[in-house]
Regions:
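Short, compositionally stereotyped local motifs that mark structural "simplifiers"
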Residues: 1-140, 145-159, 181-182
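Conserved ATP-binding subdomain of kinase catalytic cores across diverse folds
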Residues: 100, 121-273
Length: 273
C-alpha cells in the first residue's frame, strides 16, 4: 500500500536570533515528540540524507557558524528550513550587517554557481570568455539583516541574482536580493532599510560593489544624495552601506541600493505592474 504525507511540520523554534557576539552562548531548538531535528552548517539544505541529527536541540556557539535547522517526521512533510547566522565579532562593526546563507553549489559550482567564472556562462561585460556571473540566473538564499544595534529585522528566503555591467567581474560581486511569493508567500521586505525615504514596500535590494569607485564605494551614492536633497524635482536611489557575510565568511563593505527598475516605482510611489 502507498503512504502519503499528511500536513507539514511547523518550523522549529530557535531561541536566539541571528547576531554578532563576543562571548560564547547556547542556542536551544525545539524538537516536538516523534520528530527528528536535522541541521547543516555549510549553507546546504538539511534533509534525511544531508546534514546531521541533534537529539537534544542544544548547540554551544563560540565561533562564527551558520545553522540551517529542519524538522522531519514520518508521515508528514518536512518543515520549512530555519536559518540563523551567529557571527563572531572579531572586528569593529558599526554598520548594519547582511548575511546571505545558501548551498555552496548555488554560488561556487562551475556549472551552476552564479558567483564564479565557471564553465556554463556567456561572454560580455568586458569578458572574452564565458562567465557564469554574466548569466541572469536566480538562486535561492536566506537573507538576514541586522541593524546597527544588532537586532535581526529581516530573515527571509529570497532569490539572489548577479547584477551590474563590467563590474560583474570585480570582487566582491554586486548582486540583487529579490523577495518572491514562492517563499513564504511574501514578495516584499517589511523593514525600512533606507531611513532617508518614506517607506512603502521594497521588493528588491541591490547589493553593489561601487562599480568604478571600488575603493571608497560611495561616489555614486553621494552624487545621488546630493541630487535627491537639492530641491530639484529629480529622485535618486537610496543608499545604505553595510558589511556583508556569505555563509559566515566576511566579504567586506558593500552598498544596499534601491533598484532602478519597476520596483523603484513601486517602493517610492506605489505604482505596481
Amino acid at each position: 500500500a502507498s503512504t502519503f504525507e499528511v500536513g507539514r511540520m511547523d518550523p522549529p523554534m530557535v531561541d536566539k536570533d541571528a547576531q554578532l557576539f563576543k562571548s560564547p552562548f547556547t542556542v536551544t531548538v525545539s524538537i516536538p515528540s516523534g520528530a527528528t531535528l536535522r541541521y547543516t552548517t555549510d549553507g546546504s539544505t538539511p534533509t534525511l540524507n544531508n546534514g546531521q541529527t541533534s537529539t537534544t536541540g542544544i548547540f554551544d556557539v563560540s565561533s562564527t557558524v551558520t545553522y540551517r535547522f529542519r524538522l522531519i517526521k514520518e508521515g508528514t512533510l518536512p518543515s520549512a528550513v530555519v536559518t540563523r547566522s551567529y557571527l563572531y565579532k572579531d572586528r569593529d562593526i558599526v554598520l548594519p550587517v547582511i548575511s546571505v546563507v545558501t548551498d555552496p553549489i548555488n554560488l561556487y559550482d562551475d556549472s551552476l554557481g552564479i558567483y564564479v567564472r565557471g564553465v556554463n556562462g556567456r561572454t560580455g561585460n568586458g569578458q572574452r570568455t564565458p562567465c557564469n556571473w554574466n548569466m541572469d540566473w536566480d538562486r535561492p538564499v536566506n537573507f538576514e539583516y541586522l541593524t546597527t544595534d544588532g537586532e535581526m529585522v529581516i530573515n527571509q528566503e529570497v532569490d539572489m541574482a548577479m547584477c551590474g555591467g563590467w563590474s560583474r567581474a570585480w570582487t566582491p560581486h554586486s548582486f540583487k536580493l529579490k523577495a518572491e511569493k514562492i517563499y513564504e508567500g511574501k514578495n516584499f521586505y517589511d523593514y525600512p532599510v533606507f531611513k532617508t525615504k518614506p517607506y512603502l514596500k521594497h521588493k528588491t535590494f541591490q547589493i553593489r560593489n561601487g562599480g568604478n569607485d571600488n575603493g571608497s564605494r560611495i561616489k555614486d551614492a553621494a552624487l545621488q544624495e546630493i541630487v535627491r536633497t537639492s530641491g530639484i524635482y529629480v529622485d535618486g536611489q537610496a543608499y545604505q552601506p553595510a558589511v556583508h557575510y556569505i555563509n559566515g565568511n566576511y566579504v567586506g563593505l558593500l552598498n544596499i541600493r534601491e533598484p532602478n527598475n519597476k520596483h523603484f516605482a513601486y517602493a517610492n510611489y506605489g505604482y505596481d505592474s
